[in-house]
Amino acid sequence: MAKDDVIEVEGTVVETLPNAMFKVELENGHTVLAHVSGKIRMHFIRILPGDKVTVELSPYDLTRGRITYRYK
């Protein structure tokens, strides 16, 4: 999958789950299961419920995503 194929959307973290997984509610109302990208994990960036984040979604599975940015 090329980098151009991903869909970037913004959302809010609703719930934290084990193994660095999060339930994120997108701006359009959908809820997706998202994991943390490697750079966020490397730099020990904390993500808590209520945080606004950017999520990358694959066009093949719109129910799962990757958190790529946490807004300050």
UniProtKB/Swiss-Prot annotation:
Oligomeric form and interacting partners: Component of the 30S ribosomal translation pre-initiation complex which assembles on the 30S ribosome in the order IF-2 and IF-3, IF-1 and N-formylmethionyl-tRNA(fMet); mRNA recruitment can occur at any time during PIC assembly.
The protein's role, per its UniProt record: One of the essential components for the initiation of protein synthesis. Stabilizes the binding of IF-2 and IF-3 on the 30S subunit to which N-formylmethionyl-tRNA(fMet) subsequently binds. Helps modulate mRNA selection, yielding the 30S pre-initiation complex (PIC). Upon addition of the 50S ribosomal subunit IF-1, IF-2 and IF-3 are released leaving the mature 70S translation initiation complex.
Signal peptide: none
GO molecular-function terms, A-Z: ribosome binding; rRNA binding; translation initiation factor activity
Record keywords: Cytoplasm, Initiation factor, Phosphoprotein, Protein biosynthesis, RNA-binding, rRNA-binding
Family recorded in the similarity comment: Belongs to the IF-1 family.
InterPro entries linked to this entry: NA-bd_OB-fold, RNA-binding_domain_S1_IF1, S1_domain, TIF_IF1
Protein name (database record): Translation initiation factor IF-1
Modification Phosphotyrosine, positions: Y60
Record-annotated S1-like domain positions: 1-72
Predominant location category: cytoplasm
GO CC annotations, alphabetized: cytosol
Primary gene name: infA
Subcellular localization(s) per the UniProt record: Cytoplasm
